[in-house]
Structures are given as structure tokens and as C-alpha cells.
Amino acid sequence: QKFIKLKKEKFFKTLNLDKKKPTCFIFSHNLLDGNLGGKSILIYNDYLSWLRETLKCLETLDNKVNWILKEHPSNYGYLKIKTNLSKEYENIISRSKKNVKIFPDNFSREIIPKIADAIITLGGTSGLEYACLKIPSFTSAGIFYSGKGFTIEYKSKAQYKYYLRNLTRVLAKKKNKLKSNRAIMNYYLMYGLMRFDHPLLFDYDISSKMNVDDFMKKIFKLNKEMNINSYYKFERYLKHQINGNNIHFINEDKI
């Protein structure tokens, strides 16, 4: 898909938003993926509950902030669910609410860091990614990158809604205290140092239409073409983690 690239002026004009107002992006989640894992503090039971509560709160707010909702890029599980961001938006946000928009799926994401004054997520990687770019990120506490000093974290539904209602006030108080250098370090550790391209694995979406025969053909092909040295490297690094009782797998090629 070819994405439309817009300059700031054109973007705000296209979405009929006031460019003088603060702009906050809210990143929705894949509504089926990771609902039950990776959270030591459970604020919402699932991503759909969080999305609905967020939209309901936005519906009650004034128009002093531009709120732009971004759908998750993954198609995982969409064939198995009856709702999505667009449907929830249509059901909850009134047509008179001119400052709450959905980011068009044919627009390039390159514009986001150029115009975002803040971003919000429940527990997605966007909170880490945009923190690396020195954009204040509101996330729930108790997720895999929280507690490091580079995000603004909410520990309850009440605190989350307070942040939504008082976004500019909270930003003025907390923005300059955020440590984006820690975000960059955490991103490298998680997506560089602890990642390894296993020669026998490939990206597979269980909601795709690949049948069993196609799946097995892909596996057999990977076995046939496998780089044995790469496999032995993975085996060595994994043994090092297990024997050392280490929490994390380390790809020593990237040290």
C-alpha cells in the first residue's frame, strides 16, 4: 500500500483540526493480542474495555485538545472479532465532536512525530518508541517498559481519566522530567540485544488463510535451507541463558 505523505498544514486542514491546539495521539491495540499477559498491574480487563472507556471520556471533554486515534497496524485476529476502532468510534463519538478524529489508514505515519505533543497507550510499544523521540508517552504502570523514568504512568482508571481531562496541565508539570535517553537504551536492549533471527522460524499469523499443507511446505523448506551455524549460535546463547539462570536471552553478536 502506498501511503500519502502530508506536511503539517495540509494534515490539519485535511482532518479539519485546529493546528494551534495541542495534539495527542491515542494508539489502539490489536484487540485480541496480549490481553492477559505482561501486566503486573491490571487496570483494564482487556484492550477493548480500555478503548471504550477512553472514547467515552473523550466524548465528555471540551475541545481544547486535538485527539487523534490510531488503529493498530497488525491484522492479527481481525477475522475473529466483530468490532474494531472505527466501529467503536462511530458508536461512541458524536458527529458534533470535531476535535476527535481517526488517523486515516492511507496516511503515512511519518507525520506523527512532527505534530504529536503527546501519545497515549495502555501497554503498546508505541509508548517506548515515541519516548525515544522525546515525545511524552502516557502508559499504564506495570507493563514491560514502565518504571524507567521515560513515561508518564497511570496506576488506576481514575488517574488515567484525570490525565485525559488535564492533559496540558500534566504535560507542563512532567514533560521536562522524562528521561528519553533511557528509552533509547531500553529499546536497543529489547529489540536489538535480546533478539535473534532463528533459522527455523518465520512470521506466521494464525488468522491468515495459509492451510496446513502450505505451512508444512514452508517449514520443510526452512529445514532444507537452514544455516546450521546460525542454529548452533542460537543453541549456544540459549544454553548460556539457562545455565546461568539469566532472565534474558542475549544475542552476543550484537554486543
Task: Please tell me what each predicted stretch does.
Residues 22-25, 64-68, 101, 117-120, ...:
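Beta-sheet entry/capping signal
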Residues 31-36, 74-79, 109-112, 127-129, ...:
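Flexible loop/turn segments at secondary-structure boundaries
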Residues 104-152:
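A donor-sugar binding/catalytic signature common to diverse glycosyltransferases
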